[in-house]
């Protein structure tokens, strides 16, 4: 969440930033509540000072055996006033906190202004899309023809947007995960295997709740949610903690299954592995000092790109515009892999700097020096990578005229075979 003091001091700049994001939010009511809250605080403090003075006078009169009944009645009245004002103050603070939970992060100055994905800016490309001299098949057809992906049985046992991996398809998924985790560990990330169920507070901490509740799978009758990404449990590892400044930055990588309702995705990517209710993903999460976070974003993005380079998959990196960024992000790079059947690049990773937005919600701080006041860390995360989409990209980019798929060299030690089919 944003810093209330910053919003109060810079209302016009914050309102302009929200407009650039396309957020239809007026700060007027929030700022009015803030003015009322501050006035109440002053009034309550004044009444408490008066109560203390009256209490001292009552004690003096009782000691002198003088009548203090009128003052006692006055103190009760002051106490009632304080309670009423405290109750109002609590209601206002809860209202302000709730409103703040719906206000998105402010875009970094380097983020291009725009309203949709059409305004995103390409940063770089790697690799050249392959030219095929035979009809290109989509990954879902390749998977079914090789008997390694079963969409029909996935739908039978669960419903739409679920897939069963079989034989070398299951091994390929596992091999991709292991390559990603081993590579990131070699590049300095500490592996974490997190819970797949988290509580509501964890979802609030990373910004999924309350705004995106319809996209989450909640466990009925409990406080639990299935995680939409390992970002949630890994970021919340340090909720309500003050981190050792000497140990920053902290780099974690985590493999997890991810669960998304995809409430707003009706009719989009209905076939294949691109948009599933359950999918595997490797996540990279960083906790850094504020002054280093944008350097760390560049490194994180390069770490995600490195996996695609190992696999020989063409991709491009784009900077998301203000209107296309996620709710909690201050800046985001999307990495898009080339999918021949689409004739286009498709997202396979989002790498974001959230600055102190998540840390403020989750109360994750560090002490810059031993006697310094704690400050909020900056948090970053990125997919390193989405596993199902990586499998889809391998099947499509590495397909052969005879219907087989050549395994990228980096995966062969994990697969034990060089080719699927053929």
Curated annotation (Swiss-Prot):
Domain of life: Bacteria
An example Gene Ontology molecular-function term: catalytic activity, acting on a protein
Record has Protein biosynthesis as a keyword: yes
Catalytic activity: tRNA(Ser) + L-serine + ATP = L-seryl-tRNA(Ser) + AMP + diphosphate + H(+); tRNA(Sec) + L-serine + ATP = L-seryl-tRNA(Sec) + AMP + diphosphate + H(+)
UniProt xrefs under CDD domains: SerRS_core
Keyword match Membrane: no
Matches recorded under SUPFAM superfamilies: Class II aaRS and biotin synthetases, tRNA-binding arm
Residues annotated to bind ATP: 260-262, 347-350
Cited function: Catalyzes the attachment of serine to tRNA(Ser). Is also able to aminoacylate tRNA(Sec) with serine, to form the misacylated tRNA L-seryl-tRNA(Sec), which will be further converted into selenocysteinyl-tRNA(Sec).
Domain comment (free text): Consists of two distinct domains, a catalytic core and a N-terminal extension that is involved in tRNA binding.
Name of the protein in its database record: Serine--tRNA ligase
Organism whose genome encodes this protein: Heliobacterium modesticaldum (strain ATCC 51547 / Ice1)
Name of the gene encoding the protein in the UniProt record: serS
């Amino acid at each position: 969440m944003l810093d209330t003091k910053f919003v109060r001091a810079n209302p016009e700049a914050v309102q302009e930033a929200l407009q650039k994001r396309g957020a239809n939010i007026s700060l007027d009511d929030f700022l009015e509540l803030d003015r009322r809250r501050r006035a109440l605080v002053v009034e309550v403090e004044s009444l408490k000072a008066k109560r203390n003075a009256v209490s001292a006078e009552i004690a003096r009169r009782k000691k002198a055996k003088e009548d203090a009944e009128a003052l006692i009645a006055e103190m009760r009245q002051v106490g009632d006033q304080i309670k009423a004002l405290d109750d109002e103050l609590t209601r206002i603070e809860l209202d302000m906190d709730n409103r703040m939970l719906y206000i998105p992060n402010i875009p970094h100055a380097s983020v291009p202004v725009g309203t949709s994905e059409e305004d995103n800016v390409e940063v770089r490309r790697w690799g050249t899309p392959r030219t095929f001299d035979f009809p290109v098949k989509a990954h879902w057809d390749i998977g079914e023809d090789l008997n390694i992906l079963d969409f029909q049985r996935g739908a039978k046992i669960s419903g739409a947007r679920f897939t069963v991996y079989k034989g070398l398809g299951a091994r390929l998924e596992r091999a991709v995960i292991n390559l990603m985790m081993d590579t990131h560990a070699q590049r300095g990330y500490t592996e974490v295997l997190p819970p797949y169920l988290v509580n509501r507070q964890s979802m609030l901490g990373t910004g999924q709740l309350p705004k995106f509740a319809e996209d989450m799978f909640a466990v009925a009758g409990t406080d639990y949610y299935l995680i939409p990404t390992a970002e949630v449990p890994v970021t919340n590892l340090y909720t309500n903690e003050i981190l050792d400044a000497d140990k920053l930055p902290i780099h974690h990588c985590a493999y997890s299954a991810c669960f998304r309702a995809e409430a707003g995705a009706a009719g989009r990517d209905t076939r294949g592995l691109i948009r599933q209710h359950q999918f595997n993903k490797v996540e990279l999460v960083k906790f850094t000092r504020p002054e280093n976070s944008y350097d760390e974003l560049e490194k994180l993005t390069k770490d995600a790109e490195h996996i695609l380079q190992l696999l020989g998959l063409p991709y491009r990196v784009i900077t998301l515009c203000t209107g296309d960024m996620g709710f909690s992000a201050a800046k985001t790079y999307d990495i898009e892999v080339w999918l021949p059947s689409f004739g286009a690049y498709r997202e396979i990773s989002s790498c974001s700097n959230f600055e102190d937005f998540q840390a403020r919600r989750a109360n994750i701080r560090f002490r810059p020096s031993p006697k310094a006041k704690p400050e909020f860390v900056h948090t970053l995360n990125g997919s390193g990578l989405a596993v199902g989409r990586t499998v889809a990209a391998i099947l499509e980019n590495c397909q052969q005229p005879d219907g087989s798929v050549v395994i990228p060299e980096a995966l062969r030690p994990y697969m034990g075979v060089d080719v699927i089919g053929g």
